Amino acid sequence: MLERPTGVTVLAILYVLAAVFFFLAAAVSGYLAQVASTTQLGEIPYAELFFAFSGIFFSITGTVWLITAYGLWKGRGWGWWLAVIFTAFGLISSLLSLPKGVVGIVVLGAILYYLTRRHVREFFGV
């Protein structure tokens, strides 16, 4: 098997870090769902439901990002596809939020460019 490119290692670590932040957001959302009824948040209609669903969303997203990190780390083709899809969605989102999305366009464009380089695709077998 080919040696993992350094950039792929960096991306896998970044995906793990992002997953950690998603799990932290899930924990905060879960906490807010619990205390919403006993604080001023309870005055907001459906606050508990919103925070509960936010926590579920963040948990699922964090799990998917961890799975993607594993796929990148191990050189799995599906990990490459997930990273390309998430990067493309992020790029589209940044394009839709111009002009503030310029930094995202540059960073995500560079990541997408890197993921499509021959040596990276060969590592993933795609």
From Swiss-Prot:
Q: Which UniProt keywords apply?
A: Cell membrane, Membrane, Transmembrane, Transmembrane helix
| Keyword hit for Transmembrane helix | yes
Q: Which GO terms describe its cellular component?
A: plasma membrane
What is the annotated localization of this protein? Cell membrane
Q: Which cysteine-cysteine pairs are annotated as disulfide bonds in the entry?
A: none
Mode of membrane association: Multi-pass membrane protein
Q: Where are the transmembrane segments?
A: 13-35, 50-72, 77-96, 101-115
Q: What is its main location?
A: membrane
Q: Say which domain of life the source belongs to.
A: Archaea
- This chain's protein is named Uncharacterized protein AF_0864
